């Protein structure tokens, strides 16, 4: 349970740049925890996205081909099933419209905490997530 699962984000046939930011954060966290980085992409054209995600620092890429555009139910089920199969220490999801749609559902199904708007991850002494607060 030291691996990190990163969920890639795409829109209109393009992998979004935030996906690479998430992979970098996931790699740093996995290194601190002594684990691997698993990337996943759900939706259309997943083979092309998988090639783009299969870069240095990514140990495995998992795909779920389903439609062309985002589907809440499919993404929620896919990420939940992958979490149950891999049992990672953390799941890193995009803070995008789609990510904020399915992330709470995944957390609820798995009975796990969810931190949105995270600005930092640290695995040196357990798992610490930093989130800015305003007020």
State where each predicted segment sits.
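N-terminal glycine-rich FAD/FM-binding segment characteristic of electron-transfer flavoproteins
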Residues: 1-135
